[in-house]
Regions:
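Short, conserved clusters of charged catalytic residues that mark active-site
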Residues: 13-14, 24, 108, 131-134, ...
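P-loop (Walker A) phosphate-binding loop of NTP-binding proteins
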Residues: 21
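PAPS-dependent sulfotransferases, especially Golgi type II membrane carbohydrate sulfotransferases
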Residues: 1-17, 190, 218, 222-351
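Amphipathic alpha-helical recognition patches that constitute DNA-binding helices
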Residues: 17, 28, 147
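PAPS-dependent sulfation machinery
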Residues: 41-127, 132
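A conserved segment at the C-terminal end of the G1
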Residues: 27-38
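Catalytic donor-sugar/metal-binding loop of nucleotide-sugar-dependent glycosyltransferases
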Residues: 37-41, 147
Length: 351
C-alpha cells in the first residue's frame, strides 16, 4: 500500500496474526493475504513485540516521540526489507500526533509498506512472524480485538525442511521439542478462546487451496478471491531487492503455484531413528493436530536420550524471555545475534 495520503480511521482496521513454526506454510499464508485486495501485510519483522515494552503505554504521541519510534523501529532485524521511505513514513506518523494508541501507530507502519499487490477498502492488517507462535498470549493483550490464523505442518516434514535450510541446529529431538512447545501453547489458547483462532494444516491448504482459503476468508469476513492464487506471477517483483541472494532458496515456493510436492518428504528424508526421536518427543500432540504416528509405543530410553536437547530447547525460551526484559537497544542487539548462535550450534553438531 502507498503512504497514507490523509488521516484515516485506524480503529476500523483490525489485525490478525499468522502463527506457526518456521517452514510450516506461514509465508504462503502471508503471500495469499498480501495478494488479497482487502488485506495488507508486510515481510516478517516482529517489531510489535520488540517495541511494545518501550512504547506500549504511550497514549500521547508528540513529534519527538514519533520520530524516536521510527528511529527505534529501524533497529529491528529485517526491517530493512520493508524499504520504508523515512520522510514519508514520518509524515504519515505525524498525522496521528496527540492522543493515540501504540496499536494504531504500529498500523501506520504497515500502511507505509509498498506492496506489489493492489489494495482497497482495507479491512485487515496481517502480521506474520514465526516467533509469534510463542507470543500469542502477549499479542492478545496488545491487540484485544485481534484474531489468529495458526498453521501447522507434519512435524516430520517440518524437521526435514528446517534441517535443509539450517534455521536451527539440525537435531530431530530439538526441532520436535520446538514444534511440540508452540503447538501445545496454541492448542490451549485455541481451546480457551475458540472464536479468536482459526487452525489450518499446511497439508490441507496444499491439497485443496480454494476450499481452505475460502474458509479463512469467511472467518475474516472478507470475500474469497481466486486471483490470490496468482501470487507467483509477481514473485520476481516481490523478491527483487527485498531478499538477499543467499536467502532466495528459502522462498522458492513463491515462484510456483500451490502444490503438494513437499508433502510426505520425511518418509525418504529422515532416518528411522530421527522419526522415532520426533514421535517420542511430540507424542500424542501429533494426533491432536491430525498427524498419524508411525511408532505409537512410548520409548522411555529414547526419551531420556532426547532429554538434553529438550532441556536445551527450553533454555532457548528462557534466554529469549531474559532478552525481552532488557533495555530496548540491548535487546535488539542480542536478537540480531540470535541466528548466529543457532548457526554456531548447528556447525558444532555437524562436527
Amino acid at each position: 500500500m502507498q503512504t497514507i495520503p490523509e488521516k484515516i480511521d485506524l480503529d476500523g482496521i483490525r489485525m490478525f496474526f499468522i502463527l506457526g513454526r518456521p517452514r510450516s506454510g506461514t509465508t504462503l499464508l502471508r503471500t495469499l493475504f498480501e495478494a488479497h485486495l482487502n488485506t495488507i501485510t508486510a515481510p516478517e519483522c516482529g517489531f510489535i513485540i520488540n517495541m511494545e515494552p518501550k512504547y506500549g503505554k504511550v497514549t500521547h504521541w508528540t513529534k519527538e516521540v514519533l520520530v524516536s519510534f521510527y528511529d527505534d523501529l529501524m533497529l529491528n532485524p529485517k526491517i530493512g526489507n520493508w524499504e520504508l521511505d523515512r520522510d514519508k513514513t514520518i509524515e504519515s506518523l505525524l498525522l496521528y500526533q496527540g492522543e493515540n494508541s501504540f496499536q494504531n501507530i504500529c498500523k501506520v507502519i504497515f500502511l507505509n509498506y509498498k506492496s506489489v499487490f493492489a489494495s482497497e477498502n482495507v479491512k485487515w492488517i496481517a502480521d506474520k512472524n514465526p516467533t509469534y507462535a510463542t507470543y500469542a498470549s502477549r499479542l492478545m493483550k496488545i491487540f484485544p480485538d485481534a484474531v489468529f490464523l495458526h498453521i501447522t505442518r507434519d512435524p516430520r516434514d517440518n524437521i526435514v525442511s528446517i534441517k535443509t535450510f539450517e534455521f536451527e541446529a539440525p537435531i530431530a529431538a530439538l526441532l520436535a521439542y520446538r514444534w511440540r512447545n508452540s503447538s501445545i501453547k496454541l492448542f490451549k489458547l485455541r481451546k480457551k478462546y475458540p472464536k479468536k483462532f482459526f487452525h489450518i494444516r499446511y497439508e490441507d491448504l496444499a491439497t485443496e487451496p480454494s476450499k481452505y482459503t475460502q474458509m479463512m476468508c469467511n472467518y475474516l469476513d472478507i470475500p474469497f478471491r481466486e486471483d490470490v492464487f496468482d501470487y507467483y506471477k509477481k514473485a520476481d517483483e516481490r523478491l527483487k531487492g527485498k531478499v538477499e541472494p543467499a536467502d532466495l532458496k528459502f522462498h522458492k515456493g513463491l515462484l510456483n503455484p500451490i502444490n503438494t510436492n513437499r508433502l510426505g518428504l520425511w518418509e525418504t528424508k529422515l532416518t528411522d531413528k530421527e522419526v522415532r526421536y520426533a514421535e517420542t518427543v511430540i507424542g500424542k500432540w501429533m494426533e491432536m493436530y491430525g498427524y498419524e504416528r508411525k511408532y505409537k509405543r512410548f520409548d522411555l530410553w529414547l526419551w531420556l536420550k532426547a532429554l538434553p536437547w529438550m532441556l536445551y530447547g527450553r533454555s532457548l525460551y528462557i534466554v529469549r524471555d531474559i532478552f525481552d526484559i532488557m533495555p530496548y537497544s540491548v535487546q535488539i542487539k542480542l536478537k540480531n545475534k540470535g541466528p548466529l548462535l543457532a548457526g554456531f550450534v548447528g556447525k558444532m553438531v555437524k562436527k
